[in-house]
Amino acid sequence: MSRLVGLGLASKIYRNNNIKGSDKYSNNGNEIVWGTIGNASTSQGIFFEAVNACGVLQIPAVINIWDDDYGISVHNKDHTTKESISKVLSGFQVSKDSAGIEILEVKGWDYQSLMKTYSHAEKIAREYHIPVIVHVTELTQPLG
């Protein structure tokens, strides 16, 4: 998560400053950084620090949260307030009055909605240069 913040900030710096030679490794700062994390790991402090930094710095990022309702063998109710990281993070939600993070939620088994949601997330991050969280729920564990 901390690397995600650094890479997103680099894109913002390239966009806001005319850096000689940056055209060799930047498209005028219009890159977005993609990161991924499991729902159980969102209970760790570094996740909240990274999300807050993304919101404060307004960096172009898409953060994917894969949620299978469990953290190893513990249900969400035992490690996440409100049993939903989207609900926990709702205070970060961007509004017309203040900057923040766009939070999208989609079911992992709904392929068409996944395509639509990710297309929308990419557009928001790239065009408006703000962070987006995509909370993918109702996933199954690989071994059952």
Region locations from a protein language model:
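Glycine-rich ThDP/TPP pyrophosphate-binding loop and its adjacent helix/strand module
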Residues: S2-G144
